[in-house]
Amino acid sequence: MLITIPDLLTPEEVAYMRQILEGTAWVDGRSTAGDQAGKVKRNLQVPVDSPEARELGNIVLRALGRSPVYSSAALPAHILPPMFNRYDEGMTFGAHVDGSIRVVPGTGQRIRTDVSTTVFLTPPEDYDGGELVMHDTYGQHSVKLPAGHAVVYPATSLHSVTPVTRGSRWASFFWAQSMVRDDWRRHMLYDLDMSIMRIRSMLPDDDPAVTGITAHYHNMIRHWAET
């Protein structure tokens, strides 16, 4: 399940974040990659323990908190602190799967990575290449979104970032442990929740059709969720 969230960040938030990132230090992105991913990863990242990463990460987390689409798609139990990367000319990230377990910086707490998210911080017209590509049994799916838009996808996905051939592509990325670890179940729950929203736009909340399907949704959550 691949879901895009338009305008997760406001234009003002994007502008502020880019201003801060312009003046921050960047390090080799391979410092946070595993052995296999490190062999195909060529990008730069903001150190996860830097003041800039913490400040900007909190902006992203607040944006997630006001996004019902993210909540419905990810059903997050825990969200790892958002990170920030950049791909300059010639930089790329070959096909890989994200590590299944990550440690929350400074705590030692281990989080299962069920859901991945990328938030684009650079307008697509400012760079060539840099598409996020999902590889699955149905082929390849490229994602290149406006600044402030986000894409949410299963962390189990084989994916890559194509080489940047002009400009620089900046983004925030992070993972969540979902209350529902199985992607197919999350997909069904998301589709059902979107149907509920559409029905509620046409019928009053006390209509039996609305209360019935809403009860069904919450009972499925109750059956599948881990907290």
Swiss-Prot record:
2-oxoglutarate binds at R169. One of its GO terms (molecular function) is iron ion binding. One of its GO terms (biological process) is intracellular iron ion homeostasis. It comes from the Bacteria. This is PKHD-type hydroxylase Pden_4677. The keyword Iron applies. Gene3D superfamilies: q2cbj1_9rhob like domain (2.60.120.620), Rabenosyn, Rab binding domain (4.10.860.20). It is an enzyme of class 1 (oxidoreductase). Residues 78-178 form the Fe2OG dioxygenase domain. Binds 1 Fe(2+) ion per subunit. Fe cation binds at H96, D98, H159. It comes from Paracoccus denitrificans (strain Pd 1222). PANTHER family: PKHD-TYPE HYDROXYLASE YBIX.
